[in-house]
Amino acid sequence: MAVDQHYENFPVASFLVPPSMRPFVAAIYRFARHADDVADEGDASPDERIKTLDALGLDIRSLFRGERPLAPTVLGLSALRNANLPGVSEDLFHALLSAFRQDARTGRYETFDQLLDYCSRSADPVGRLMLALVGVQHPQALRHSDAICSALQLINFWQDAGLDASRGRVYVPLEDFAAHGVSVDRFPASPEHQALIRFQCERAEALMRSGVGLLTHLSGRFRLEIAFTIAGGLRILEKIAANDFDARIRPTLRWYDLPRLTYLATRAWLDARRLPL
């Protein structure tokens, strides 16, 4: 899932996050980072990676049963668990672990629906945990959060498409290669692949914009944080487009993007306010 790269663009623990939330956010991040490293880093076999992830799953179960877990990153979630916040459920952590297990054994996806299913477990649970921290559990807010988080995950894929391909992972659905009449071979080195990346980016942008209504359920610094998170994703898409959708070029956010990010964040808030209640 490339957690570090994900938060490089979309830092959920930034200074805009209310101070009372930061320890919980940091604990969630450390857990996700550790599990992501288990799935992706080092030279362990897929079976060994899955065995370690299964052990983390047992620790999560112990944590939510009031027992002391063994893994430090799971133990670090104790304060969050003990806060008894509505919406902080064991299932969300198991969903994350199921996505990491999939990372350990799967490098390609046949369909977009399969990719979205992966996003629903690799990204959406984090958004739902963040909403639980601010006491937002409205069903519509959760749906909007899922759209934003899945869009951010997709944007991260298209930002890193060239790097992932060099590691044997191609997140562009194979059905889309067929639909565009191009081969997965040599992806993304062929110019014919640029139209394919454009299609993926357009789809991710539409999904992101479908979730801006979340902002109407939030307030204060956290609303601003999420508005800038949305803006970060949209800005990466703009940079991919500026590179003519050449996935061999990895765009990043820089300090000089702040004015554009501010504009995009403001635009997201205005778009959200125009939505029917």
Q: What are these model-derived regions, one by one?
A:
Residues 1-152, 158-277:
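Catalytic cores of Mg2+-dependent Asp-rich isoprenoid enzymes
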